[in-house]
Amino acid sequence: MSEITNTMGTIIAETACGHEGDINKLKLLIDAVSFSGAKIVKFQIFEPAERVTVGHSEWDSFHKLALTKDEWVEATNYAREKKLSVFADIYGEWSHKVAKHLNVDGYKIHSEDLLNTKLIEKVATDNKILLIGVGGAHRSEIFNIITHLDKINLCKKIILMPGIQVFPTPIDAHSLTEVEDLIQKYSPFGAKIGFADHVSGDNDVAFFLPLIALSKGAFIIEKHITINRADKWIDYQSALGKDDFKKFVNFVENISNLNKPIPTMSDYQSVLGKDDFKKFVNFVENSSNLNKPISAMSKYEKQYRKMFKKVPVAKTDLPVGKELTYDDIVYKKFDGIKIPLASNYLIGKKTKTTISLGEVISYDKLENKIGGIIIARCKSNRLANKSLKKIVGKETITHLIERIKRCKKLDCVILATTADPSDDALEEIAKQQNILVYRGSVNNIALRFYEAAKKYDLDQIVRITGDNILRDEVLLDTAIDSHLKQCCDVTSTKNVPAGCRNEIFATHIIEKILKNAVVKENTEYLEYFLTNDRYFSNNYVEPDYSFNENIRLTIDYQADIDMLEKVFENFYFTNPSFALVDVLKWLDDNSDIININKLQKIKFKNSELDVRLEI
């Protein structure tokens, strides 16, 4: 099967669970694949315990659909009698062992297992073609597995398969731009790109969309097959019936035989015939959404993630202080919980609570060093020495440090300033406040964050900008708790006043940004990278209070200092630990204070600013 990665236009006939747990129905599907002229049939081999936890809402369904090892042997032998190659979806150790026993020709890892690093590595070492589903994946997840495999030279037979299924799957749930973009990003690693089409089988587009994907560079097309759509066997929604599948195979083979990277419209006309060509032209002329730029995760991708993604669970009882290994972790669907945490980020971490067999593994059950990193320097284009300006007798940076030190969930507070002598005073203040100090790059703020985190061995970073001195430490503690439970790449506080937002993220996230930013200088605008869910999984925490949207609690101008002076004069002398919520209530009754600086402009990114990542 090595030629599969060198020949564009291969079709994989996906039987999925269309057999409904009946070996005889599966044989009929195999007959249909053979009749169509496709060369590869794919089976979904699994036992229920590989897919879901006991008691999961789909537990009984998977039991009804699962075939035995002997039945898979029978089905595979039958397919080979029909001169078909056999691929198998792998969902865990059991299905991998069965597939190896069957000596299948290739594997696929479903997108639900994309975070199961060890399983993918183990399957890849069999040195067979390996399709990896990446539908509904954040790019950081794809980048994580490809770079992991690349380090051990296992990318050469990898084919990434974009495509999602949401029952029914609308046309605009697919992105052909995704195919081109994945080729650009991951072909340098040696990986190829395919396309898993899930358009409703009763739509003419079900024939045409894969043809366009081929012209975009897809090597393989995966397409669901059924006998007769009217019978409505399981998984029929995205499937073509027997006769239509044969027609589809004929289209693809004729286009592929032209040996043209980009077929012309006259090529399509000669292959499709007059009537189908008219439908094809209409599709192309009305498919602009399929070629839209990739900027954020679509609602369909988010829906797909909720339906399919597995979470890490304990393979056995884990005591306190246990250092995790791959043997301690399995991935299963868990009702109501979606932990987007790859297994290679769990390895080596120690448990801080007991974790029972089958219990979800999340950061809050593991040792994590969490540091609040305050970024500050004295030189500023808009307000020089703003960190040293005094409000009620104390430097603004001192007020900020005092508030952050009240956070109960932080293991340490670090002032990350520059190596420029002008910032010596900031280092002295940090030492007086008994917090840690890191001095680094003058202009590369993201690098300063990263190097400070590495110096003090942080697992998780709380991003704190030095000109936002009225942080809500209570909300910040709540956000840290949420971050450790949800295990997203990034947790942000939102619906807070200007100057009160925080981001919490793992140290490896900022490393990805630094190494892969298209324009390195733009990493200064770190929040725009962090909160792009095309790249990273995001979790949000909101306060339970309201506020006047004109309130501005950041420092960029002298008017900001003047406004904050009024706030501190009202609260600080009677209660130095005053809460942000009390400030917001007071400002509601004193709008004249808000007016002091409400007309000052907040520094938003220019719409032309390039904050893309090469992942």
Where are the regions that the model predicts?
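Short aromatic/basic micro-patch
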Residues: 239, 271, 312, 323, ...
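N-terminal glycine-rich phosphate-binding loop and ensuing alpha1 helix
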Residues: 369-417
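Short phosphate-binding loop-to-helix
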Residues: 419-482
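Short acidic/polar active-site loop segments enriched in Thr and Asp
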Residues: 39, 105, 219, 410-411, ...
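A short, N-terminal amphipathic alpha-helix
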Residues: 28-40, 395-413, 428, 432-433
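Catalytic cores and adjacent flexible loops of soluble metabolic enzymes
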Residues: 1-368
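Conserved core of the sugar-phosphate nucleotidyltransferase
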Residues: 471-552, 559-566, 582-615
